[in-house]
Amino acid sequence: MKRRMTRRRKKVCAFCADKNHKEIDYKDVNKLKRYVSERGKILPRRITGNCAKHQRALTVAVKRARHIALMPYTLD
């Protein structure tokens, strides 16, 4: 059996593509929930398509939101 070589398109960072965004805010829980799995883990760059700069800012924002109890640490 031969495997077909399919090239996947590189995902574009949603924060870089949106020129109107100012910064990633830890109080915007609805936006942060898109980057957290159903188990409560932060999704990696290769899945979300974020650039390194915005992935780091997103991680800090999620951790801050968890610390002040806006988001849960885990979901059971």
UniProtKB/Swiss-Prot annotation:
Family label: Belongs to the bacterial ribosomal protein bS18 family.
GO biological process terms on file: translation
Protein name (Swiss-Prot/TrEMBL): Small ribosomal subunit protein bS18
The keyword Ribosomal protein appears for this protein: yes
InterPro entries: Ribosomal_bS18, Ribosomal_bS18_CS, Ribosomal_bS18_sf
Gene encoding the protein: rpsR
Highest taxon of source: Bacteria
Molecular function GO labels: small ribosomal subunit rRNA binding; structural constituent of ribosome
